[in-house]
Every structure is written in C-alpha cells, then in structure tokens.
C-alpha cells in the first residue's frame, strides 16, 4: 500500500457544491473497473467519470486534463496512466489518488509518490480494483457481496465457486455503465439470490457459446520471443471462458485475441503450473496483470510478424 489514507474523515470530498470538481478515471471495458467507478459514485454522486482503456490515445487523456483545474481532486481506480502521463494531472490539480492492482503499475506509483506531495496511491496485487476502492473509502468491514464476487473473478480465485461465475455472468451486461452498476453495489440478499439465478442461465448460455467456439475455431501459434503461444480468436466477453479451458486442454499458457482497427488485444490465461505464466508473456509485450490472467496490446503489423509461419 502507498501513502494514501483510507476510510478516514480527512478525505476531501470533491463535490460541486463546495467548489471542487471531482474527477474519476477508471478502467474502460472492465467489470472490475466499472464496479470501482460505481463505488466512486456512491461516495461522490457528482463525480465526473471518465473511462480509459490501456490502449488510450494521449489526446483522450489531454481532454480529461482540460476538464480539471487547480482545485480538482482526481481518483484513478483500477487503472494507472502510462509513464510520463500522470504528471500532466498531478502538476495541474489539487490532488491525485491512484488505486490499482495491476502488477506493472506498482513501481511507477512508488516513484510518483516519492516525487509529488499531492499524489498518493493504494496498490495490492492480491485484491481487485473495486475491492480496494471500497476499502479506501468505506473500510474492510462491509464490502458488498457483489464486489467480493467481482474480485473473486477478476483475480481468478473463485473462492465462492459457481456463485462467482453466476454473479459476474449477470453483471457483465453493466460493464462500462457505472451508474447502472451502482444499483447493484448494495444489493440485498434477496436481490443477490435473483442475480445468481439469472446469472446461472446466462452462464449456461455462455458455456454453450464457448464450446462452439472451441469446436469450430482452431488456435494459431504466436512466437513471443522464444515462446510458442497458442492464440484463439475470441470475442472479448468470452475471453476468460475460452482462455482458461484452452489452457487446461493444452497444458500451457494461451491467449485469446481481438482485432480493433490497427490494434490487437491479447488476453493471456494460464494455470499455476504453467511456465511461462500469463503475466510473464504479457510483460514481454509491455503488458501487465496477474500471474494467470494478463493482457497486452500490439499493432496489427506486429501481430502478423509474430504469427508462426
């Protein structure tokens, strides 16, 4: 953990009615990032939320910087900016708090914390972004069950077994919509039961789609340095479903990929016994994540160069 103080009355509340604009930057296209943003909304109903993906363009960040002033407090949750980019905000706004759990971010955050008095951070690779954000503002005691399910899936533990799978299958439809996710943050036990029932049906349908993809689409091999990695063309919403089944079937770390314009997003998945790990492969391509679930992006040209001939 960095120098940020959580669950403390000294936290400045960045609401419009006290003249301070609060800005929240969160991980785009990610269920955990969306839940972290929903937690921000719960704490600060007037916060200005701005999503960024790991492939963000510098102009996207510049637009956010333009929206701030020297009284703004910026919370970056389940995400960290690229090297040299955080300074754009830190040097303009009143305060920046960065809450993240992606392994490639820790050293950058430590350096920023050392160099800037108005920057603080929370980092823990064993937790998820939403869980860390909740703990920062509200403490460990009353973490909502749905946040626990999201964390359980995001760091690929599945302590709650199928309940985790059912919950995230249902909640995935709200990814990218923190204002809708907020409705579920403090769901009652009865509401959670209904979510799990509906999520079970969705999960069964997803499993069928996964099986069709694995049956009808064969992986190709990528050469990543000295490693030959099977990669499967899989829609984003099924990346973990397909990735982990394929990794288990092939007995090695694999990746799924999607092509978006000139960018190819690779999601690496593996198991504890696999070497190299998902994280090690992602880091070769300047990506990051967790040991068994990590991601990186390459250009379309770089991707074709890596395809094993």
Regions found by a protein language model. Name each.
Residues 161-219:
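Active-site-proximal loop/helix segment associated with metal-binding centers of metalloenzymes
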């Amino acid at each position: 953990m960095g120098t940020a103080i959580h669950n403390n009355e000294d936290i400045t509340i960045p609401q419009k009615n006290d003249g301070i604009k609060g800005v929240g930057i969160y991980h785009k296209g990610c269920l955990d990032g969306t839940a972290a943003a929903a937690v921000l909304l719960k704490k600060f109903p007037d916060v200005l939320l701005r999503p960024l993906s790991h492939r963000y363009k510098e102009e996207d960040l510049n637009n956010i910087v333009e929206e701030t002033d020297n009284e703004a407090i910026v919370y970056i949750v389940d995400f960290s900016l690229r090297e040299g980019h955080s300074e754009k905000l830190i040097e303009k706004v009143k305060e920046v708090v960065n809450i993240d759990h992606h392994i490639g971010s820790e050293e950058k955050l430590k350096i920023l914390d050392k160099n800037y008095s108005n920057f603080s951070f929370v980092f823990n690779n064993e937790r998820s972004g939403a869980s860390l954000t909740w703990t920062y503002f509200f403490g460990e005691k009353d973490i909502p069950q749905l946040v626990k399910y999201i964390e359980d899936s995001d760091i690929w533990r599945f302590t709650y077994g199928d309940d985790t799978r059912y919950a995230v299958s249902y909640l995935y439809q709200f990814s990218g919509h923190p204002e809708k996710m907020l409705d579920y943050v403090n769901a009652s036990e009865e509401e959670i039961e209904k979510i799990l029932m509906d999520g079970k049906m969705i999960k069964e349908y997803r499993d069928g789609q996964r099986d069709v993809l694995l049956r009808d689409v064969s992986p190709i091999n990528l050469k990543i340095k000295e490693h030959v990695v099977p990669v499967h063309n899989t829609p984003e919403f099924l990346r973990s479903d397909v990735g982990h089944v394929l990794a288990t079937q092939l007995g090695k770390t694999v990746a799924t990929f999607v092509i978006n314009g000139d960018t190819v997003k690779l999601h690496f998945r593996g198991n504890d016994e696999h070497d190299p790990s998902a994280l090690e492969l992602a880091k070769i391509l300047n990506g990051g994540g967790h040991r068994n679930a990590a991601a990186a992006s390459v250009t379309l040209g770089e991707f074709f160069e890596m395809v094993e001939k």
